[in-house]
Structure formats: structure tokens, C-alpha cells
């Protein structure tokens, strides 16, 4: 039976990562397919959908603050707006959140995403006194599908393609497996069909995301091996001039065939996103990262040798329980010597429900922040060195907005920018000459 939401104005506030953004796009696609219309002004919406993040404390605080601000705005304007909350925060806290925020009209879990149009229609038609929330499935099975309608929230020339959902890793600092469930892959055919549709709509950059892209397909092959290279082979056969960018690769699952694929492909961006988290063995062991220092060093060295002109990006955690000054100095030394092309660092966040939260040796907040600052000071100097080497070179860039572009070494909203002449058209590749730089960004003409 078709659901009619004709004329209902829907607003969206999407928080958190690119994977959550894909969920937001699917929910909007379902609502618009049912007749709703999108408004860019949350206060004008009949239905305000807030898709939350619940990963670490700052993200949880942002989600709660956003919900409270929406409730306050509705109260002060006397608007009969319905507030719908979805995403990781609710999936993680369930009844606790609904008890804390009774003003929210509807909470939706991950498995409710494909049925959001039905729940919103029911919300509109049901008197407030008899509202009933859908039962929350704490072992979600939802996987994005090519058949799901989707309203892209990114510029038309790039988009995120979620190839899998969930995670099987036992990292002691992370709550994601508890929130998102076990790893479950889409089929190669399903992913390729969506990529084809994106290219037909003018997409120039397809960004593959999941909790661990290098784990892709292991659940489809009884855990024997990843199917990521097979997926990349299929995507490379698609016609058109576009980049394929991979995010969230796990160092434990890289292999020779994947390195070979990166080194020979003409469509895969020479951009390796590989969060190592740390280099000290005692810390890696407590994190349960399934890697060790010697393996990480050898893998990164092999990448540098075999994948020419690649940018290697990593993410680090400092202040993990038990991280000694010696552990931290080893990390600093490694960052200084290896010279990552792109790097991000997070002070450890103790998350309830994780093994690390209960570990001895919790590091004071002031020490965590000082260590994170030190790492970024090192990286800033490295970035200046690398940018200085690019002055005078001609690079291919993708123009995002008037005056702003990116190289294949830069992911949207995460990495550096190239400042280009304003007349260059957004959504197109072009070549520019680098004439200067400022810290992380390049300046071109």
C-alpha cells in the first residue's frame, strides 16, 4: 500500500560520519518518494528529522544539544512540529534516551530506516496521547540497497557509497559493533548498480565507505577472504572519468593483491586511508587492533614503495589507558620519521560499555589534550614540507565550489583544499599549477 505524505515539509539535521549521512539520504529518499517536500530551514518543517551520532562523548553531546535546541525552538514558536530522532545515539541508548526526552515525537532505530515513511505517516495520523514507538532491534540487520530511494545531500559531483554495514572487530575502545551489529556486505552487483546510477547522474568521485572497507565480502565468502579487489575490478569496468576513493581501511586486512590493485588502477584515487591508531605494541595489544609495530612499519613501507605518488592518511588515538610517556614518544618519533601525508588525532574518549573504559591506567584529560596537540604540531610541519615540494607542479584537481578544489590526495570535508581561480566550473576535473601554500592548503592558478 502506498504511503501519502503529500505536502508535508521535512527538515533534516544529519550529524556524525559519512556512513550516517548515507542513512539520512535514504530516509529522505523514502519520505520524498511518499510525497513529502524538503525544506532547508528546520524551523519551517512539519517533520524535523535529527539523525544522531553516538560514537564518542563530543558527538553524543552535539546530538543531545541539537535535539534540545529543536525542542526549545518548537516550544518558543508554538509550532506544531513533529520531532523524529534516529541514528546511533538512539540505537545505543534506546529507552534511556526516550525517557530522557519525552518531548521527541518518534524515535527510530536502524532497522526502521526503510519504513520511515510508514512511521511518519502513522505519527501524523495518530493523536499525541496514543503515540507508540517502534520496537528497537538491538541486533540490527539493515543494509543499504540500490533499490532504496535516496536523496543525495552532497554536491552532485561526489557521493558516498556504503558497501557494508556493521563491524566484527573487537577493538576495546569502540562501541560501534554494539550499535551497528555484525558486519554485513552488500553484493557486488548491488554496489555496482548504484555506482552506475551515480555516474549517470554526473558523479565524478565515488567514495566507498563502511566500518572497515577491507573486510568487505568476508561474510559473503564464509570468512575466507575479502571480496574488495573483486568489487574494485567490477567498478573499474564502468565507463567515465571518475575517481574511486576508499575510506576506513583496516591495516590488518591489507594484502598484496589490494596493494597491486591500487598501484595499477587508473580510477582508484591514490589515497590510502588507514587508521593505525598507534605504533607502540603495548598500546596496540590493549586496543586489540590485531596488528603490531613491525607489521605496520612493513606494510606502510611497502605501500610507499609500490603505490607511486600515493597519499597515506592515518588516524591516531593518544591517551589510551596505560599509554606511557615512552609509548607516546615512540608514536611521536614514528610520526616524525614516516611523515604521513595526511593525519588526524583524537584524545581517547572513555565510552561506557567498552572494555577500555574499565581498564587501569586512565590518562588525565589534560595529558590527552597535550599529547594530541603535540602530534598535530609535528604534522603541521610535515604538511608544510610536503606542500613546499608541490610548488611549481601541475596537478589534476576536482573543483568543489567556485575557488575551491581538491587533489586525489584529499577527501571532502576531511583533508586539505586547493584554492583555484573562481572561473573554474564546479563538478569538473581540471589541471592547475601550484604557486604557493599555507600550512595544509595549496594555492593554484
From Swiss-Prot:
How cofactor binds (record note)?
Binds 2 [4Fe-4S] clusters. One cluster is coordinated with 3 cysteines and an exchangeable S-adenosyl-L-methionine.
Tell me which residues make up the MTTase N-terminal domain.
8-125
Q: Which reaction does it catalyse?
A: L-aspartate(89)-[ribosomal protein uS12]-hydrogen + (sulfur carrier)-SH + AH2 + 2 S-adenosyl-L-methionine = 3-methylsulfanyl-L-aspartate(89)-[ribosomal protein uS12]-hydrogen + (sulfur carrier)-H + 5'-deoxyadenosine + L-methionine + A + S-adenosyl-L-homocysteine + 2 H(+)
Q: Which InterPro entries match?
A: Elp3/MiaA/NifB-like_rSAM, Methylthiotransferase, Methylthiotransferase_CS, Methylthiotransferase_N, Methylthiotransferase_N_sf, NA-bd_OB-fold, Ribosomal_uS12_MeSTrfase_RimO, rSAM
Q: Where does [4Fe-4S] cluster 2 bind?
A: 167, 171, 174
What Pfam family does this protein match (any one)? Radical_SAM
* Cofactors: [4Fe-4S] cluster
Show the GO MF annotations: 4 iron, 4 sulfur cluster binding; aspartic acid methylthiotransferase activity; metal ion binding; protein methylthiotransferase activity
Record: residues binding [4Fe-4S] cluster 1: 17, 53, 88
Its GO biological process annotations read:
tRNA modification
Identify the GO cellular component terms for this protein. Answer: cytosol
Keywords assigned by UniProt? Answer: 4Fe-4S, Cytoplasm, Iron, Iron-sulfur, Metal-binding, S-adenosyl-L-methionine, Transferase
Q: What is its EC number?
A: 2.8.4.4
Do you know which PROSITE patterns this protein is assigned to?
A: MTTASE_N (PS51449), MTTASE_RADICAL (PS01278), RADICAL_SAM (PS51918), TRAM (PS50926)
Q: Residue ranges of the Radical SAM core domain?
A: 153-385
Where do the TRAM domain residues begin and end? 388-445
Which N-terminal residues, if any, form the signal peptide? none
Intrachain disulfide bonds = none
Report the protein's function: Catalyzes the methylthiolation of an aspartic acid residue of ribosomal protein uS12.
Entry-linked NCBIfam families: 30S ribosomal protein S12 methylthiotransferase RimO, MiaB/RimO family radical SAM methylthiotransferase
The protein in question is named Ribosomal protein uS12 methylthiotransferase RimO
Q: What is the lineage of its organism?
A: Bacteria, Pseudomonadati, Verrucomicrobiota, Methylacidiphilae, Methylacidiphilales
Amino acid at each position: 500500500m502506498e504511503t501519502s505524505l503529500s505536502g508535508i515539509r521535512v527538515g533534516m539535521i544529519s550529524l556524525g560520519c559519512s556512513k550516517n549521512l548515507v542513512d539520512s539520504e535514504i530516509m529522505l529518499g523514502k519520505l520524498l518518494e511518499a510525497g513529502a517536500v524538503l525544506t532547508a530551514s528546520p524551523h519551517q518543517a512539519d517533520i524535523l528529522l535529527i539523525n544522531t551520532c553516538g560514537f564518542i562523548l563530543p558527538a553524543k553531546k552535539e546530538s543531545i544539544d541539537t535535539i534540545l535546541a529543536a525542542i526549545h525552538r518548537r516550544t518558543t514558536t508554538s509550532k506544531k512540529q513533529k520531532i523524529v530522532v534516529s541514528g546511533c545515539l538512539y540505537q545505543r541508548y534506546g529507552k534511556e534516551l526516550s525517557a530522557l526526552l519525552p518531548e521527541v515525537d518518534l524515535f527510530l532505530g536502524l532497522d526502521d530506516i526503510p519504513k520511515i515513511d510508514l512511521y511518519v505517516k502513522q505519527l501524523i495520523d495518530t493523536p499525541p496521547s496514543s503515540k507508540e514507538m517502534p520496537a528497537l532491534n538491538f541486533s540490527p540487520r539493515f543494509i543499504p540497497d540500490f533499490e532504496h530511494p535516496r536523496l543525495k545531500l552532497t554536491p552532485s559531483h561526489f557521493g558516498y557509497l556504503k558497501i557494508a554495514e556493521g563491524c566484527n572487530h573487537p577493538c576495546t575502545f569502540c562501541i560501534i559493533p554494539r550499535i551497528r551489529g555484525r558486519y554485513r556486505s552488500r553484493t557486488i552487483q548491488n554496489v555496482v548498480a548504484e555506482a552506475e546510477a551515480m555516474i549517470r547522474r554526473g558523479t565524478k568521485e565515488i567514495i566507498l565507505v563502511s566500518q572497515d572497507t577491507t573486510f568487505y565480502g568476508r561474510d559473503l565468502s564464509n570468512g575466507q577472504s575479502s571480496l574488495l579487489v573483486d568489487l574494485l575490478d567490477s567498478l573499474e569496468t564502468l565507463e567515465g572519468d571518475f575517481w574511486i576513493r576508499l575510506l576506513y581501511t583496516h591495516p590488518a586486512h591489507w594484502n598484496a593483491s589490494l596493494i597491486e590493485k591500487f598501484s595499477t588502477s587508473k580510477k582508484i584515487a591514490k589515497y590510502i586511508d588507514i587508521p593505525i591508531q598507534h605504533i607502540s605494541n603495548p598500546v596496540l595489544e590493549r586496543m586489540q587492533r590485531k596488528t603490531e609495530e613491525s607489521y605496520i612499519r612493513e606494510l606502510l613501507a611497502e605501500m610507499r614503495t609500490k603505490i607511486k605518488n600515493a597519499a597515506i592518511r592515518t588516524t591516531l588515538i593518544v591517551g589510551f589507558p596505560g599509554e606511557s610517556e615512552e609509548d607516546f614518544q615512540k608514536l611521536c618519533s614514528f610520526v616524525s620519521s614516516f611523515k604521513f601525508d595526511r593525519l588526524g588525532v583524537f584524545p581517547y574518549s572513555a565510552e561506557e560499555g567498552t572494555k577500555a573504559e574499565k581498564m587501569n591506567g586512565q590518562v588525565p584529560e589534560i595529558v590527552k589534550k597535550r599529547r594530541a596537540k603535540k602530534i598535530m604540531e609535528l604534522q603541521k610541519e610535515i604538511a608544510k614540507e610536503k606542500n613546499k615540494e608541490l610548488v611549481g607542479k601541475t596537478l589534476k584537481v576536482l573543483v568543489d565550489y567556485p575557488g575551491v578544489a581538491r587533489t586525489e590526495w584529499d577527501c571532502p570535508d576531511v583533508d586539505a583544499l586547493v584554492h583555484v581561480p573562481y572561473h573554474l566550473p564546479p563538478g569538473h576535473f581540471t589541471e592547475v599549477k601550484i604557486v604557493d601554500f599555507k600550512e595544509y592548503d595549496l594555492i593554484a592558478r
